[in-house]
């Protein structure tokens, strides 16, 4: 399903009757609504960042809900799409704190390839309807992913922005890992 070590780690989930039933509901949502990201990008974060290579996890809430924005990575948008305010604020903090100049694109694919798992807690959303799939069942999978990452021997940095993401800290108990929390980067959260 993914094409890397996540397949074996998540096999127990993929093969469970509960997940199959849940994923059927997701497929029905795609048939009857405009849903983002495109279906072939739902698991893009896992495809681009293997379990073995994950060094940083940035937890988002759910995908952007505008046309052409979401492509399976939290806080990231496809090339050619204007940089969203949340990501502009992330870039501003990187510049202010570390002197890293802001990127000219909102596509964070390179971050993912370098070991930053850009994981939304909810992996799909209906067009123009934020949080529309929040109660659908994605969090069973994504919470399990966070618990698997907690088991890693190598230290992992978990970046939890906003109250929604901070709730995930309860799954991170390994003292080797670092949890960084702060308000959500959205200008509406300030």
What are these regions (language model features)?
Residues 3, 11-160, 164-173, 178-183, ...:
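A polyanion-binding, active-site-adjacent surface
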């Amino acid at each position: 399903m993914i094409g890397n070590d996540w397949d074996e780690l998540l096999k127990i989930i993929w093969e469970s009757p509960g997940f199959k039933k849940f994923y059927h509901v997701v497929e029905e949502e795609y048939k009857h609504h405009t849903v983002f990201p495109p279906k072939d990008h739902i698991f893009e974060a896992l495809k681009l960042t293997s379990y073995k290579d994950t060094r940083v996890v940035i937890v988002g809430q759910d995908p952007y809900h505008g046309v052409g924005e979401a492509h399976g990575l939290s806080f990231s948008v496809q090339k050619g799409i204007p940089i969203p305010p949340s990501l502009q604020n992330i870039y501003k903090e990187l510049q202010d704190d570390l002197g890293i100049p802001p990127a000219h694109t909102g596509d964070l694919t390179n971050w993912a390839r370098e070991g930053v798992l850009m994981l939304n807690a909810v992996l799909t959303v209906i067009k123009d309807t934020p949080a529309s799939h929040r109660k659908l069942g994605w969090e069973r999978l994504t919470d399990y992913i966070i618990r698997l990452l907690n088991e890693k021997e190598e230290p992992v940095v978990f970046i939890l922005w906003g109250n929604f993401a901070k709730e995930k800290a309860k799954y991170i108990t390994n003292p080797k890992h670092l949890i960084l929390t702060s308000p959500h980067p959205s200008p509406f959260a300030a």
